[in-house]
């Protein structure tokens, strides 16, 4: 049974601006304040991940925490919004269909949401809950049928959520392909086919990175 995807909760509004913020003469511009707030959230989230053992879990390229930080940085290079970058940093918090190690429980989602915000946490859960075998082929379709592997529910998420998911997936897979040439050689052709089928969901920077990383010959 297919149901529409409903997002939990609402984002908190930006703090009220005071003075002539846009030109910075009487205070920091709104964009700078948001960037500073996002950087603070990143640091707090990284400490949470480290406290849950992410800095000691082996992962291609070093540790899980190092991988998570690289994914977040890559999303930033592509111009992703702060919530997407935060989700990239925490994308393995509930484990994934390809990496079963959990740092936190899906039954306690408020804990992570309290650190990175509800929008970012929704994407973390969405990414973690993906039944990849079922969902990947449907993701670029108009309805975008998506199966939650934790509950078995089939959803029809909005395209904006699917775009964020595709961007995060690309950053995750391209980081692994970059740091591990053997895995790149083994899985690169399949990843290229996957991301080609998702072209309508990927940003131009992400699409260029796909070709730079996995479409060129392995040397």
Spans of model-derived segments:
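Divalent metal-dependent catalytic cores for phosphoryl transfer on phosphate-bearing substrates
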Residues: 51-58, 64, 71-197
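Charged, compositionally biased N-terminal leader segments and the immediate start
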Residues: 36-45, 50
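Charge-biased, low-complexity intrinsically disordered regions
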Residues: 194-213
């Amino acid at each position: 049974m297919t149901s529409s995807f409903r997002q939990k909760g609402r984002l908190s509004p930006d703090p009220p601006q005071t003075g002539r913020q846009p030109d910075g003469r009487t205070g920091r511009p709104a964009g700078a304040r948001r960037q500073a707030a996002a950087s603070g959230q990143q640091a707090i989230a990284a400490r949470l991940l480290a406290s849950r053992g992410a800095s000691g879990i082996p992962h291609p390229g070093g540790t899980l925490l190092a991988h998570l930080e690289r994914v977040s940085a890559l999303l930033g290079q592509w111009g992703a919004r702060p919530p997407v970058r935060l989700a990239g940093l925490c994308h393995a918090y509930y484990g994934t269909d390809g990496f079963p190690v959990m740092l936190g429980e899906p039954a306690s989602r408020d804990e992570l949401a309290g650190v990175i915000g509800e929008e970012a946490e929704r994407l973390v859960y969405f990414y973690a809950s993906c039944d990849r075998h079922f969902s990947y082929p449907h993701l670029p379709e108009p309805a975008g049928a998506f199966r939650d592997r934790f509950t078995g529910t089939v959803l029809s998420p909005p395209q904006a959520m699917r775009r964020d998911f595709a961007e995060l997936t690309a950053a995750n897979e391209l980081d692994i392909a970059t740091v591990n040439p053997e895995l790149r050689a083994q899985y690169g052709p399949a990843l290229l086919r996957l991301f080609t089928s998702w072209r309508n969901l990927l940003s131009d920077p992400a699409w260029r990175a796909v070709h730079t990383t996995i479409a060129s010959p392995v040397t």
